[in-house]
């Protein structure tokens, strides 16, 4: 645990609640003080669903601190079992209530005796894992619980019978995921085009009673690194089900994804050939491949960009920028530091540097130092971009309500490739656009742009020098300012005058 002004990944209980609330007819009891109970409001605001968020807070108050929680937690579980009649109740503490060190396992066992539904305590260490790791662990725990339950009851004896036609499960589509609902729709369309049936999607919209049928699929699809791989490995161990974990984001990676599905099916005796489909989609249906060869896209060649987000999206966008659009990625980074080795291996050949950090101030300073033409990041990088007047495209969680679009905006598959190309192209300020906006009064440009976030400049600009700097076109002003300040520091100057500006310009040959 650490005290932070702002976090990229939330606390562990948010991950558990995201997974539990994604299932149909599953209720969650959150054992927490007031202040930790913001999940309901957050999900209701962002997901725009018509149903209430199925989460109840068992409040840790003064009475609980004096008498203990057992009576209150058990009473809330039994009450919700009677009122909501769920198939499963998931009990989770928060990092705050975990400090009490109460035996919640005992509370759950006691409540199970008086409840019709199943009751499960989320097996998560709230001090050591974040939202994404907890979501991964909770999904695996629920799947394992119901498969073991089916085996004990005799519903699942021996290897499960596969579906007649090739089918797959999609693992990892969840509530509050970045464009997950749109990605699911696009994945369904892609799989349908390939002649593959859909067995189950988990956790989004799935019933826990159907989890015993997961083994009937021919293979599993894991589109995101952050949620699903642990469950996919478990299903492979239990049923021998192979899994495809290539993220079909961008034209090249979508083709790799389809080819891996082809390989999996060929190994199981199904002689499919998807190359004609890949060719048709790439050359004639998807606009992304055509656009990447157009004169418009050539305007982006060599432009500088930075990328930051979760491992899945940051790695995919870095590859698309560098490989498909010719953009120079100065650095790519991720806040999933626990998966840093994989990220480094994925993006190492497509960018100059790799940044692995959970500290948003380090990310902001790295952006300010590089002064890219565009940023591709999270909600926080959008804020940084606004302060630095650098355009930003949001490509990863955490995100705000405007990144839960009502229209169809997938990131996966061929339509996702089109959407990403639009996002990338529209994020750059092209040609003389910025200068023309200034000439015709597009924005207020009286203030000099400062390209430092953590600390103010130690140099003083005279009024005349500042006025001269304001005359420089906006799209190069930051570079001129930075070079002038560097020139002054190298010579031990503390004040920048017109003479210093001209000397710096002459020294740099600009």
Swiss-Prot record:
UniProt EC number: 1.3.7.7
* Any Pfam family the entry gives: PCP_red
Q: Keywords, A to Z? A: 4Fe-4S, ATP-binding, Chlorophyll biosynthesis, Iron, Iron-sulfur, Metal-binding, Nucleotide-binding, Oxidoreductase, Photosynthesis
How many cofactors are bound and how?
Binds 1 [4Fe-4S] cluster per heterodimer. The cluster is bound at the heterodimer interface by residues from both subunits.
Q: In which pathway does it act?
A: Porphyrin-containing compound metabolism; chlorophyll biosynthesis (light-independent)
Q: Where is the active site?
A: 296
Q: Name one GO molecular function term.
A: 4 iron, 4 sulfur cluster binding
Residues binding [4Fe-4S] cluster are 36
Q: How does it assemble?
A: Protochlorophyllide reductase is composed of three subunits; ChlL, ChlN and ChlB. Forms a heterotetramer of two ChlB and two ChlN subunits.
Q: What function does this protein fulfil?
A: Component of the dark-operative protochlorophyllide reductase (DPOR) that uses Mg-ATP and reduced ferredoxin to reduce ring D of protochlorophyllide (Pchlide) to form chlorophyllide a (Chlide). This reaction is light-independent. The NB-protein (ChlN-ChlB) is the catalytic component of the complex.
Family of this protein? Belongs to the ChlB/BchB/BchZ family.
- This one is known as Light-independent protochlorophyllide reductase subunit B
Q: Origin organism of this chain?
A: Synechococcus sp. (strain JA-3-3Ab) (Cyanobacteria bacterium Yellowstone A-Prime)
